[in-house]
């Protein structure tokens, strides 16, 4: 039964990742905890497997469409590794309830920022804001990129969510990428950061339920293929607004379950 549930939820998670370039961990962590009964630390470790594999498949569509900044994405991803290693080690030392509460707070903050940005864009911002062509790192400065990447990596490792929901806002707000290009490039960063975060959990008390997690990941990869083309059909402002609403919705659900526990 758990494997069947994982297959169903995995497809939905994959569609979100493919369409938005983010959101896999946001959905897989609560799903593994509340639908499949896993411990928060185990769920966060398992979600890194799901997000990393899903991101690999989901990267195909934006790469073909030219919406991936390979140099900036690879640089950002490599710079996030140290933060991911430190964050993963810090995470296992925190109580599961505290981990979820902090996760909820971060979802609220990022969700509000992205929702407001999407609404402002709808009121007249240019859909192509931030050309994203060559050298975003150079335009903003190496220190800003390094700080954003390290911070992203730490939060990725700490919460075990792959980092897409942090990477997309960072690429948009710190590096000036358009939303569609940030979504595509974030998948590359997610692959690097989730791999580093998972490696850092080796030897800790986090356990991955491999049959469930691999079923979840396989279904999510299928969903990622289905979700990729959706990016072409939606405006940048719509994607940004939908992303913010998604984060706030998951935040509300997590807060409700924490208070009801």
Locations of regions flagged by a protein language model:
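Short hydrophobic/aromatic, small-residue-rich stretches within specific transmembrane helices
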Residues: 47-51, 186-190, 212-213, 217
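Short helix-coil transition sites and intra-membrane helix breaks within transmembrane domains
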Residues: 17-26, 156-163, 181
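Interfacial segments of multi-pass membrane proteins
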Residues: 28-42, 166-181, 200
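Transmembrane alpha-helices of multi-pass small-molecule transport proteins
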Residues: 46-61
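Alpha-helical transmembrane segments of polytopic integral membrane proteins
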Residues: 29, 53-56, 112, 168, ...
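Juxtamembrane transmembrane-helix boundary motif
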Residues: 1-15, 34-35, 40, 60-158, ...
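Hydrophobic alpha-helical segments of membrane proteins
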Residues: 19, 154, 158, 191-199
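Conserved glycine-rich helix-kink/hinge and helix-boundary motifs of the Major Facilitator Superfamily
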Residues: 45, 73, 183-184, 244
